[in-house]
Amino acid sequence: MATRPQPLGMEPEGSADLLHGPEGARGQYGSTQKIEDLMDMVKKLQKVGSLEPRIEVLINRINEVQQAKKKASEELGEAQTVWDNLQKELDLLREEKVRLKDILNRKEETLRIMQLHCQEKESEAQRKHSMLQECKERISFLNSQIDKEKAKLRKLRLDFEEHLETLMSQHKDTLEFHKPEHLTKEMCVLDSSKEQLLKEEKLMKVKLEDVRQRLCALGGPEGSSSLIEGLFLRSHEAAAAMQMFKDENKKAEEFLEAAAQQHEQLQQRCHQLQQKRQRLKEELEKHGVQILAHSTQNEEDSSWRMASPKPVEVHEETAQDQERPSSRT
């Protein structure tokens, strides 16, 4: 029994079960095209008037169309299943995308925080490096200043030691000169020189008196005495005696003058040496106080400055030398 073709404009049976999708849309479009072709063929046959002989052909064509429709429905179901699976996978991928995007945002935030932290660390390291460089420069400057101060102190110490050695040598010379033995010897020499000069003076006086007596003895009476005196004065003996007397007198005067000058020079030298001894004693006392203060300051500043023991030793020697003259005097 042949089925009647459906009216135009009506959808075939089961078309309401078609789902939207790429494969279902292609199957639905193919089935609709075939049905429209059949309807066009029926209209053409109706117009021609030869519809009955073509019924079986139409039935066969309708069966083919139904089989194609069934096959398309199956393919559509499979496509719908694939579509659903793909849709689920798409949802999962979207969820994964959202999750990964959230992770990416957190990672980017962490990266930004780490970059800021790294920048802070770099700035801190640069600041510490600059501070370290400044500290090194300051330390080098202070070391140079310390070296300069040490050089100055060394130079001052050497100058002081040299000056102190000079004072000590002068003090020793003065001490040697002012020793009781030396002074006694000098006084003995002066006394002996004085006694020798006095003896020579007395001898010259005796010689002068002898010459006068001889002259008086040679005079005689008044008339003959003048003649004899004139003859004697004109004689070679009188000239030799006068010349000898003048020479002896001149030598005695020169010797007395030299002895007086030497005595005066010795007195002046003794006075100068006494003044010099007093001045050296005062300087030694003053330098002794300075050396003691300097040694105390060196002990206080020994954390960054080395103190030399030489000034202390020199101070001790100076104190001993000061004690010696005081004990001898």
Curated annotation (Swiss-Prot):
Residue stretches in coiled coil: 54-167, 194-294
GO cellular component terms, semicolon-separated: central element; chromosome; nucleoplasm; synaptonemal complex
Region (Disordered) residue spans: 1-29, 291-329
Compositional bias annotation for Basic and acidic residues: 312-329
UniProt keyword Cell cycle, yes or no: yes
Record key words, sorted: Cell cycle, Cell division, Chromosome, Coiled coil, Meiosis, Nucleus
InterPro entries: SYCE1 (IPR026676)
Domain of life per record: Eukaryota
Tissues where this protein is expressed: Meiotic cells (at protein level). Expressed in the ovary and testis.
Keyword Zinc-finger: no
PANTHER family, per database record: SYNAPTONEMAL COMPLEX CENTRAL ELEMENT PROTEIN 1, SYNAPTONEMAL COMPLEX CENTRAL ELEMENT PROTEIN 1-LIKE
Name of the protein in its database record: Synaptonemal complex central element protein 1
The species this protein was found in: Mus musculus (Mouse)
Higher taxonomy: Eukaryota, Metazoa, Chordata, Craniata, Vertebrata
